[in-house]
Amino acid sequence: MVLGVVGISYREAALKEREAVINILKTFEADTLLAQRFFGGDGSFVLLLTCHRAEIYYFSKSNANVQSKLLSWISSLGTRPYCYQGLACFTHLFTVTSGMDSLIFGETEIQGQVKRAYIKAKTDRELPFALHFLFQKALKEGKDFRSQVSLSYPVVTMESIVEETLDLHGKSTKDKLLFIGYSDVNRKIAKGLSAKGYRNLIFCSRKNIPIPYDTVARSQLSFGKPYDVIFFGSSESARDFPGLSLESLAGIPNRVVFDFNVPRTFTLVERPEGISYLDMDFISERVQKKLQISKQCTNKEKPFLALAARKQWEVYEKKSSNISLSQIRTSRPKLLIL
């Protein structure tokens, strides 16, 4: 039996490489036969795909070569993925969920991203006990960690990077800002800009929910209208929007476009002219320049998470052992009394 993870993050790969890895990992969701070949009939997986990481957590009863196959496939894209099994897999996901492995040290969004990845996986397919236990305990320990350990608020945030960038491009609080998608990242950016005095914030979302900002319906959306800044954060590609192209975006002079989607809304061969197109690589580079993560702080908190991971790993081993024994007993043929 193998429980493990293979993946890449912003440390190992640039945005273009992460996009390629995300695309191949998504094939497991689209091709059930491929998933069975990799993980076996009793195995399964959870994909954790965010702006800064692409990971597949897997369990297989029968295929001990899963890790080497995944490593070979991802490495063929020119990347150098990391991998962990058993206790190390527990420790890694606990560290990720707590925000200790994030680009912005201690950020809280990752907790929700891990939760949504787990919910999506268990909704889409049957998960084995191992993956249920791993993710449930990671979410629990991540929450407990934040409540027990005092972390200073990140000095650098995406909101501050966006605000600074708008200033550098000569944008003002009177400009019109269009947000495509009512996603976590768009809501966070809008909230931060609203606090700084930006008032012309307009959302366009597929969701039929109350939104505390001005809205425009998808049927009425036009990129030819004078939106000074556009934020893409809906996990959709350009082909999902009729009439959307880099040329249409460039129709408004000095327009600034933030593309928070990974994979990106546009597949770029070269940087477009006429607009300032800023993707997650731009955000990551700005954050890394400004944010110097304290290794002393990181190392100080790691034993807490490592201890929690070992504790839950030992519980998992006992529970999985009991499950195996129970399965063995129930599979034995009953003796006939003659």
UniProtKB/Swiss-Prot annotation:
Write down the top EC class of this protein: oxidoreductase
A GO molecular-function descriptor? glutamyl-tRNA reductase activity
Keyword NADP on this protein? yes
Reaction equation(s) it catalyzes: (S)-4-amino-5-oxopentanoate + tRNA(Glu) + NADP(+) = L-glutamyl-tRNA(Glu) + NADPH + H(+)
Q: Which InterPro entries match?
A: 4pyrrol_synth_GluRdtase, 4pyrrol_synth_GluRdtase_N, GluRdtase_CS, GluRdtase_N_sf
Q: Where is this site: Important for activity?
A: 92
This entry's Enzyme Commission designation comes to 1.2.1.70
| Active-site residues, Swiss-Prot/TrEMBL | 51 (nucleophile)
Gene3D superfamilies the UniProt entry points to: Glutamyl-tRNA reductase, N-terminal domain
Which BP terms in the Gene Ontology apply to this protein?
protoporphyrinogen IX biosynthetic process
- Does the keyword section mention Ribosomal protein? no
Per UniProt, the keywords (alphabetical) are:
NADP, Oxidoreductase, Porphyrin biosynthesis
Q: Give the pathway.
A: Porphyrin-containing compound metabolism; protoporphyrin-IX biosynthesis; 5-aminolevulinate from L-glutamyl-tRNA(Glu): step 1/2
Q: Where does NADP(+) bind?
A: 181-186
Superkingdom assignment: Bacteria
Which Pfam families does this UniProt record tie to the protein? Answer: GlutR_N
User: Which PANTHER family did the record assign?
Assistant: GLUTAMYL-TRNA REDUCTASE 1, CHLOROPLASTIC (PTHR43120:SF1)
Record note on domains: Possesses an unusual extended V-shaped dimeric structure with each monomer consisting of three distinct domains arranged along a curved 'spinal' alpha-helix. The N-terminal catalytic domain specifically recognizes the glutamate moiety of the substrate. The second domain is the NADPH-binding domain, and the third C-terminal domain is responsible for dimerization.
* Anything else known: During catalysis, the active site Cys acts as a nucleophile attacking the alpha-carbonyl group of tRNA-bound glutamate with the formation of a thioester intermediate between enzyme and glutamate, and the concomitant release of tRNA(Glu). The thioester intermediate is finally reduced by direct hydride transfer from NADPH, to form the product GSA.
Purpose: Catalyzes the NADPH-dependent reduction of glutamyl-tRNA(Glu) to glutamate 1-semialdehyde (GSA).
Family statement? Belongs to the glutamyl-tRNA reductase family.
Q: How does the record describe its quaternary structure? A: Homodimer.
What protein am I looking at? Glutamyl-tRNA reductase
Q: Which organism is it from?
A: Chlamydia felis (strain Fe/C-56)
